[in-house]
Curated annotation (Swiss-Prot):
Reactions the enzyme catalyzes: 5-hydroxymethyl-dUMP in DNA + ATP = 5-phosphomethyl-dUMP in DNA + ADP + H(+)
Protein name: 5-hmdU DNA kinase 2
InterPro entries cross-referenced by the UniProt entry: HMUD2 (IPR041021), P-loop_NTPase (IPR027417)
Signal peptide bounds: none
Function (record text): Phosphorylates 5-hydroxymethyluracil (5hmdU) into 5-phosphomethyl-2'-deoxyuridine (5- PmdU) on DNA as a step in the pathway leading to thymidine hypermodifications in the viral genome. The phosphate is added internally to the DNA polymer. As a final result of the pathway of hypermodification, 5-aminoethoxy-2'-deoxymethyluridine (5-NeOmdU) substitutes for about 40% of the thymidines in the viral DNA. These modifications probably prevent degradation of viral genome by the host restriction-modification antiviral defense system.
GO biological process: symbiont-mediated evasion of host restriction-modification system; symbiont-mediated suppression of host innate immune response
Pfam families listed in its UniProt record: HMUD2 (PF18747)
Transmembrane segments: none
The organism's place on the tree of life at top rank: Viruses
Region (Disordered): 260-304
Sequence similarity: Belongs to the thymidylate kinase family. 5-hmdU DNA kinase subfamily.
Length: 304
């Protein structure tokens, strides 16, 4: 029963941070396998696979060329490396066809009808999805966030897409209804909607065929993405002794938030680049060290 969790929204809303928060918690219990893909003569990282959960996080750890901080990047890296949205979607489809649940995050190329419910249900072998959007309420908060994240002033291109994501969220909700999904729960004036299929049990997240669409604020708790993934996986997590209450506690004690000149909790996940050999009259051979290898979301935000 393949599923897909898609996280997209305005730049700097902490999408990747919330994804990697769940990854790092899983790594305290399970050991992932690193996946790669090859296009032409280039082999690149594809993601991390947790076989016990049949779960793949598309992406890789990286270092920001703006802030110098370690982070998680997902579809943006594949789009940039291949220069093709079609190749990226084919890679995703290949793993979904094998029954894996995939977590894909990114922007701006995911602001597309091909990352909305209608296209995904018609082109991917999936039973359900969670589609989470993140946005800012105003430009002031966007500018402040970008300065704190990169140490530089925000540009206009990222902000211009903020309104576009809000409009796309409404389109996605309309597509779910057109596809025959019924609204099970509608919270916060349509900002968090749970859907079920007519032929399934109407209890939220009990059948494994429930989907969710949510528009979340940029300052939502660190656990909101992990919570959505957890519920899509259902009993698989509990069968592996992965309890949601433990994840909430991990978010409190081990936040993956980072700051220029401050915390950089993922630095150890990114291998240091070998230093270039100094130039001398006699050229030395530089050796590179080997590399180490149902409850709604917005409702849960009030749990504290």
């Amino acid at each position: 029963m393949a599923k897909i969790i898609v996280i997209k929204g305005t730049s700097g809303t902490g999408k990747g941070t919330r994804v990697v928060q769940f990854i790092e918690w899983l790594r305290t219990k399970l050991k992932p396998t690193e996946l790669s893909y090859t296009v032409g003569d280039k082999t690149r990282p594809f993601g991390l696979k947790f076989e016990e959960l049949k779960l793949i996080f598309v992406g890789q750890y990286t270092v920001s060329n703006k802030s110098g901080l370690a982070s998680w990047t997902s579809m943006d890296a594949i789009h940039a490396a291949t220069g093709s949205g079609d190749i990226a979607r084919d890679l995703v489809k290949g793993w979904l066809a094998q029954g894996y649940t995939l977590v894909c995050e990114g922007e701006p190329l995911m602001l597309s009808d091909k990352w909305r419910p209608e296209w995904m249900f018609k082109n991917y072998p999936i039973d359900s999805l969670a589609l989470l959007y993140f946005a800012y309420p105003d430009r002031y908060q966007y500018d402040a966030r970008i300065r704190g994240r990169s140490g530089k002033e925000a540009g206009d291109s990222g902000w211009s897409r903020n309104e576009s994501y809000s409009k796309e969220f409404e389109k996605s909700k309309a597509e779910m209804l057109a596809l025959g999904w019924n609204v099970a729960v509608d919270d916060y004036s349509g900002q968090d909607v749970l859907y079920h299929q007519t032929a399934t049990n109407t209890q939220e997240f009990k059948t494994g065929n429930d989907s969710e669409l949510a528009m979340l604020p940029f300052d939502a708790p660190l656990w909101v993405v992990g919570n959505a993934i957890y519920h899509q996986l259902g009993t698989v997590c509990r069968a592996n002794n992965l309890m949601s209450k433990d994840f909430y506690g991990y978010c409190e004690t081990n936040p993956m938030t980072r700051e220029v000149g401050g915390q950089d909790p993922l630095a150890h996940r990114v291998p240091e680049k070998p230093q270039k050999a100094s130039k001398t009259k006699n050229k030395a051979v530089a050796k590179e060290e080997p590399k180490t290898s149902s409850v709604s979301l917005l409702g849960l935000m009030r749990k504290a």
